[in-house]
């Protein structure tokens, strides 16, 4: 059950929404995870601790950093809509990638799919995204040293419209 505890803690850290649900209804943890009584009590205590909000912020900052560093004009062009589209992206892809170019490339592909599906974004988004996505893709190709190249699955983006 330790694995379930660890997964629950990771999920809670990655999802402020899940933390809020658990604060209001701690039984959510028992419904989603196989926990001992002790593990459940610890997680409920962690979620209720004021520091948990900071843990969630740090997690999200780490997910946002590759985007802010690699596609800054796209982020700026999204303006106030950045928060909503990034939150949707994180919901669609709950597990980040520590390779900044892979994470940025995946977000670019996510946003490209939303644009292709008719998503409504400021006019500056499409040209900024096209320019920066090409730069990220080239940097990603140059940075990979694995025998098997990174190939994102197109099915990952089918439901992102």
Please tell me what each predicted stretch does.
Residues 1-41:
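Membrane topogenic helices and adjacent juxtamembrane segments
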Residues 4, 48-49, 60:
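RNase III-family endoribonuclease catalytic core
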Residues 4-8, 25-28, 66-73, 85-89, ...:
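A general alpha-helix detector
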Residues 18-23, 59-68, 99-101:
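Short acidic alpha-helix initiation/capping motifs at coil-to-helix transition points
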Residues 28-29, 49-50, 91-96:
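A short structural micro-motif
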Residues 33-56, 100-119:
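Membrane-interacting alpha-helical segments
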Residues 56-94:
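Amphipathic alpha-helical packing elements
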Residues 88-161:
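Hydrophobic packing positions characteristic
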């Amino acid at each position: 059950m330790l694995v379930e505890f660890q997964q629950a803690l990771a999920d809670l850290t990655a999802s402020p929404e899940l933390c809020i649900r658990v604060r209001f209804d701690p039984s959510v943890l028992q419904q989603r995870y196989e926990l001992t009584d002790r593990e459940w009590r610890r997680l409920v205590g962690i979620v209720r601790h004021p520091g948990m909000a900071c843990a969630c912020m740090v997690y999200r900052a780490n997910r946002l950093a590759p985007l802010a560093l690699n596609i800054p004009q796209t982020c700026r062009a999204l303006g106030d809509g950045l928060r909503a589209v990034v939150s949707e992206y994180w919901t669609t892809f709950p597990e980040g990638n520590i390779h900044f170019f892979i994470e940025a490339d995946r977000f670019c592909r996510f946003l490209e799919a939303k644009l292709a599906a008719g998503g409504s974004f400021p006019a500056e988004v499409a040209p900024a995204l096209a320019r920066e996505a090409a730069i990220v893709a080239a940097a990603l190709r140059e940075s990979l040293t694995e025998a098997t190249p990174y190939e994102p699955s197109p099915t990952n983006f089918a439901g992102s419209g």
